[in-house]
């Protein structure tokens, strides 16, 4: 992690790595999904939060765990 990294970068290093190197995340409501957060890459959606995940902190923790595994499997 770069020196002077923010609290977000320390709490969610795989989310940061994802958006800097592999894809992007979308947050909020849209017309196509009822999820709160989605992770995408060039091929499309790779993950979306469950409808019943109501807190952003819980969703980001779940996304962090998913991206840690995905980055290890596909990009390591």
Regions found by a protein language model. Name each.
Residues 26-27, 59:
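N-terminal targeting/docking segments
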Residues 1-24, 45-47, 73-76:
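Negatively charged, low-complexity tracts enriched in Asp/Glu with abundant Ser/Thr
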Residues 27-48:
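Short aromatic-glycine-(Arg/Gly/Cys) micro-motifs in beta-strand/loop hairpins
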Residues 44, 52-71:
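A short, charged, amphipathic alpha-helix used as a generic interaction element across diverse proteins
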Residues 30-32, 72-75:
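Generic detector of bulky aromatic hydrophobic side chains
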């Amino acid at each position: 992690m770069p020196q002077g990294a923010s609290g977000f970068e320390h709490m969610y290093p795989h989310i940061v790595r994802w958006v800097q190197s592999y894809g992007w995340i979308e947050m909020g409501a849209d017309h196509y999904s009822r999820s709160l957060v989605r992770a995408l890459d060039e091929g499309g959606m790779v993950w979306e939060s469950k409808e019943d995940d109501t807190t952003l902190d819980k969703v980001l923790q779940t996304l962090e765990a998913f991206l840690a595994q995905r980055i290890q499997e596909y990009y390591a």
